[in-house]
Structures are given as C-alpha cells and as structure tokens.
C-alpha cells in the first residue's frame, strides 16, 4: 500500500509574500560587495490552484522550498522510511531535474527526465546518505512552450508506525477547581 508523506502544494490565497515558501525562493548573491537578487522566477499569476501551476516557456521553477522540498535527513534520522517515491504529473514539454543537498548545503543532481504531453514521472529515492543533513527537491524547466505542473506527492510503501504512549501530569494536588473549569 502507498502512503503519502507529503503533497506538493501552493498557497491558498494569492499573497505574493507567501509564494517563496512554496516555490522558487529568492536567491541573493554579492557582486562588488553589494547584494544582488539573482532570481525571481515564480509569479503568483502562474499558480492555477492549490496543486497546479503554469511554467512559462523557457523558464525554470524550483520546488526547493520550505513547504515542498522533502526533509531527507530528518526522515532518515527519525523514521523507519528508507525508500521514497516522488511522483510528478505534468502537461506539455518540460525537463524535470531532481536534486539533493548535502549537510554542507552543496546541491547535487540525482536524476533528470524530459517529458512532453500528459506525463507522470516517477523517481525512486533511497534515504541512506543523509546522516549529516540534506533535502530532496525538484525543478521544472519549460521547453519552447508553456508547461503545466499538475501535481506531485512524496510517498512510501513503508507502513507508518502506529505505536505511541502519552502521559498526563497534573501539577496540583486535591484542587479539582484548578483543573476543571
């Protein structure tokens, strides 16, 4: 059985200040001791709904963001999940590039796929090299025509752990009025 770990989503409202949390964060560099913005590719007008976005011809959009990148290091350390499947649905001519980061923040390309028409691209990823930190994400580059990102999910076949315990501590003694209103 397939279990969804994380859906790729966009902001519910059309607030451009929130967009960098979901797609294409701004990247800054320093040139001649001055900060320079080197990317600003995502535009709120290209978000079609909660799960879909237009990728304008010739443009590149990154999903290496707070809400849409997959926390590989955290998952490797704190869960039993070792195999993750990234499933991406697109329409139109595009190139999908899957990346990972190292514990030092270096970006490494894992895989690349060229797609056209209605396509579903599946990437099987193993969580065994992230003990020092790292994320997994993807970028989409539209070809000579617009493409549409139709949705994506990070999934696993690993059944979720359902065990757990809870403890309740009440810091008062013989004072039920303090606990119940």
What role is predicted for each listed range?
Residues 3-161:
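Beta-strand-enriched, solvent-exposed domains that form extended recognition/catalytic surfaces
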Residues 165-169:
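Cell-envelope/extracellular polymer assembly enzymes that use nucleotide-activated donors
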Residues 172:
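Phosphate-binding glycine-rich loops and their immediate beta-loop-alpha structural context
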Residues 175-181:
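Short, well-formed alpha-helical segments that are part of the catalytic scaffolds
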């Amino acid at each position: 059985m397939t279990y969804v770990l994380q859906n790729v989503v966009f902001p519910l409202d059309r607030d451009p200040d929130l967009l960098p949390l979901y797609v294409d964060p701004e990247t800054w560099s320093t040139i001649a001791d001055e900060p320079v913005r080197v990317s600003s590719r995502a535009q709120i007008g290209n978000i079609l709904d909660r799960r879909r976005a237009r990728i304008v011809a010739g443009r590149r959009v990154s999903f290496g963001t707070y809400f849409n990148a997959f926390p590989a290091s955290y998952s490797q350390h704190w869960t039993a999940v070792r195999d993750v499947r990234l499933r991406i649905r697109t329409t139109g001519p595009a190139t999908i590039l899957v990346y990972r980061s190292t514990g030092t923040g270096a970006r490494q390309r894992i895989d690349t796929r060229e797609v056209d028409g209605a396509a579903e691209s599946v990437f099987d990823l193993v969580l065994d090299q992230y003990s020092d930190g790292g994320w997994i994400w993807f970028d989409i580059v539209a070809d000579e025509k617009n493409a549409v990102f139709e949705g994506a999910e990070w999934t696993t076949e690993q059944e979720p752990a359902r065990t757990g315990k809870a403890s309740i501590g009440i810091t008062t003694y013989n004072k039920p009025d303090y606990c119940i209103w």
